[in-house]
């Protein structure tokens, strides 16, 4: 069976693994998932990202990050633009997540970037998800 929304599946897997405090998780790889994972790593939400080659599409291995006393670094993940209802924003209308404490993942003509980077580069795009 084909997957309708692979990005929502990725976010759900990360959310579920985070809730039960798993150290790592694996998911089917794609280019957009790699870009999202790299942003999560650079913004400090996850520890590391590995790409494992297999006979099919490859596997992304994400290593989740926890603070002192095993507290979660990722408090929330929310899919915004869905296959049935796409959400777009201009650079001037780019949303701030929790007044700048979180990030919005934005798919632009320059690839997947954060809301801060989109404002800086003055590009709009599709709001993929919020992470805080």
Swiss-Prot record:
Gene3D superfamilies: 3.30.1370.30, 3.30.1490.10. Keywords: Ribonucleoprotein, Ribosomal protein, RNA-binding, rRNA-binding. GO terms for biological process: translation. It comes from the Bacteria. One of its GO terms (cellular component) is cytosolic small ribosomal subunit. Pfam families: Ribosomal_S8 (PF00410). PROSITE patterns: RIBOSOMAL_S8. GO terms for molecular function: rRNA binding; structural constituent of ribosome. SUPFAM superfamilies: Ribosomal protein S8. Belongs to the universal ribosomal protein uS8 family. Part of the 30S ribosomal subunit. Contacts proteins S5 and S12. One of the primary rRNA binding proteins, it binds directly to 16S rRNA central domain where it helps coordinate assembly of the platform of the 30S subunit. This is Small ribosomal subunit protein uS8.
